[in-house]
């Protein structure tokens, strides 16, 4: 029990430091929990990576955070906060297509089907606009968009029948 309480105190301290703009202090506080693979530590680490607390190794910290978050949402697709942090992380890493998909999944996890479809359509438009495109991510977006549009049509049909 004491170790768990100490962990929470450390997390709260790091969160307060980050909120005050002391990213370096928050990173130092969180160092004692580096072996902890729990969701709260992972999310705080993602916040720190986004705040640039890693200094010169910032991109490496962001990539590690993206990997951890991607693993998390694959196992728990309803984790809105993890999807949102993943979207921000991909955006900061210069991966707008992946960021839009993660935004769409975050909207879906919140129950906002229209918002999810909107974000995925934005991803489709971006992919069709040319430039360096991640074809795998583009295919995932296309497939996911079809799934969500089918859900939307089913809900609309259900609504019409209930009138």
Question: What feature does the model see in each segment?
Answer:
Residues 27-31, 62, 66-70, 103, ...:
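Inward-facing hydrophobic residues that define packing positions of alpha-helical scaffold repeats
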């Amino acid at each position: 029990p004491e170790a768990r309480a100490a962990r929470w105190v450390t997390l709260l301290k790091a969160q307060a430091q980050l909120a005050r703009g002391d990213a370096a202090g928050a990173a130092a506080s969180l160092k004692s929990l580096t072996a902890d693979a729990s969701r709260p530590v992972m999310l705080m680490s993602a916040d720190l990576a986004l705040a640039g607390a890693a200094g010169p190794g910032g991109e490496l910290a962001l990539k590690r955070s993206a990997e951890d978050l991607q693993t998390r949402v694959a196992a728990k697709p309803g984790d809105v906060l993890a999807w949102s942090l993943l979207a921000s992380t991909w955006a900061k890493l210069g991966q707008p297509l992946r960021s839009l998909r993660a935004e769409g999944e975050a909207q879906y996890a919140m129950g906002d089907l229209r918002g999810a479809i909107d974000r995925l359509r934005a991803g489709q438009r971006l992919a069709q606009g040319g430039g360096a495109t991640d074809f795998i991510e583009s295919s995932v977006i296309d497939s996911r968009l079809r799934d969500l549009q089918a859900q939307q049509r089913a809900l609309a049909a259900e609504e019409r029948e209930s009138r």
